[in-house]
Structure formats: structure tokens, C-alpha cells
């Protein structure tokens, strides 16, 4: 019995020593690794023109789709803003070519990119608030920090992977419709959003429903992408979507950022798992 108790005490001492090493050394090593990865992610969002200061450089992306050639164009991205859009639309019925572009004095902020960048900055702030000289006293303290960092990273990722669901009146009321010169025809709506690593542009063609129409008017709810036949009321008119054209372009640095988010979340979870393993060795929570 004495031998068993001695062995148990020895094992406990070893475990306690390992846990102290984890708190004092490995935790800080992981925090440093996370900081380095997230700083790389942050750089992807800023894309400075020279050095680390100055305006973000402009990048041109050609819009394309494997399903249609009705819409062609080029989008110019400058950091978190769309600084130019040059779009050609071939009308399905008469093959008339419409051209519209941003007014020179206008830029369209992509809120998804801005929000994702802010969440990354908040995660970095949380990590740097515990520098190398800081001594973690309990595992619970580490778990709390990891949970807070993971929350910011999950929010950053979700902003890029989950576009907002908008109603057609919300799209019609958006300032984006007033960005173009010449002004968009009244039977067109345009929406721009991020989906994963892609910048997507959707053009909706509309037609007015006659007051004596026998169609059962049912306003469409919110959606990322509305389908032909979706109806809505705008002003005194009832309108229906007749055609939908979606084109997109891949933004390579958004793909990089998503990879960094995934790797960082995995590192956080691995550290949480290591901390939690020690709780299984004691009937009480020593951390």
C-alpha cells in the first residue's frame, strides 16, 4: 500500500511539473506562434502600396462565370474598398449592350472585409496583452484567453464565409445603386459581396407587374442570391425578377487569410486540449 501511495505521489509530482512547464513555457510559445500567423493574416488585408504605410495598392480582377457571358467586367479592389467597377451587360431579349461604371469620385466599402480585419486586430490585441513576461497561474486563465481569441477568429472567418441575406428592397435602397455613371436603369439592381475567397457581383433584371396581373403577389424574403420570379414592392410598383446574372472573381489573399484563420483556430484548440487533459488526472480541477 505504501509503495502504491509513493508511486501515486511521484506520478502526481511529475504531472504537476509538466503542468507548470506547460503554463510557463509552452503557452507562451503557442501565443507567439499565433501572433506571427495572425500578423501575416493582417498584412493580407492591408496590402500597402509601399512599406507598411501609405494607401493600399489597387488590384484589378476580371469577372467571369462558366454559365453565362451575359455579364463581363473588371472590378478594382483597393484594400477593403471597391474603387472601380466596369461592367458590360448583354440584355437577353434584344442583345443590347449596356455599359456602366463607378463614378470617379466614388468608392464602395466592403464591410465584410473591414469587419474581418477588425476581428483579426482584436485577436492580435488579446494575444499581445499577455507578453513573454506574463506568468499564467492557472489553466482556466489560458482557456479563457483561447476562448476569447477563437471567438474573434470565428467571427472573422464567418464574415467572409457567410454573406448577408438581403431583401430586394434592401438591395434597391443600397447606396451601391447610386455609384454608377451613367445611372443604372430602373429595371436593374446590382449587389456585391464576398463569399469565401471570391468577390461576387450579381445583376438582377426586373419587370413591373401590371395592376391587373393574375399572378399571386408574394414578396420574397431575404437571400444571398435571389432567383427569377422573386417579387417585391418598391415605391408604388410591384416588381418581379426576370433574369439573374452572377459573376465572380477569386481574391487570392482572401484565400490566404482563411487558411491562416483555420490554422490559428486549430492551434488554439490544441492548446485547450493539452490544458484540459490534466483535469482527468485529478478528481478536482487543479487549474
Swiss-Prot record:
UniProt entry keywords in alphabetical sequence: Acetylation, Amelogenesis imperfecta, Cell projection, Cytoplasmic vesicle, Epilepsy, Nucleus, Synapse
Keyword flag Acetylation: yes
Tissue-level expression: Widely expressed with highest levels in spinal cord, brain, heart and bone marrow. Also expressed in fetal brain and liver.
Phenotype when changing residue 271 to A: Decreased protein stability
Modification N-acetylalanine occurs at: 2
Main location: nucleus
Annotated S-S bridges: none
Calcium is among the record's keywords: no
One GO biological process term: memory
Domain of life: Eukaryota
Localization in the cell: Nucleus envelope; Presynapse; Cell projection, Axon; Perikaryon
GO cellular component: axon; dendrite; hippocampal mossy fiber to CA3 synapse; nuclear envelope; perikaryon; RAVE complex; synaptic vesicle
Similarity-based family: Belongs to the rogdi family.
Disease: Kohlschuetter-Toenz syndrome: An autosomal recessive disorder characterized by severe global developmental delay, early-onset intractable seizures, spasticity, and amelogenesis imperfecta affecting both primary and secondary teeth and causing yellow or brown discoloration of the teeth. Although the phenotype is consistent, there is variability. Intellectual disability is related to the severity of seizures, and the disorder can thus be considered an epileptic encephalopathy. Some infants show normal development until seizure onset, whereas others are delayed from birth.
PANTHER family reported for this sequence: LEUCINE ZIPPER CONTAINING TRANSCRIPTION FACTOR LZF1, PROTEIN ROGDI HOMOLOG
Subunit structure: Monomer.
Protein name stated in the entry: Protein rogdi homolog
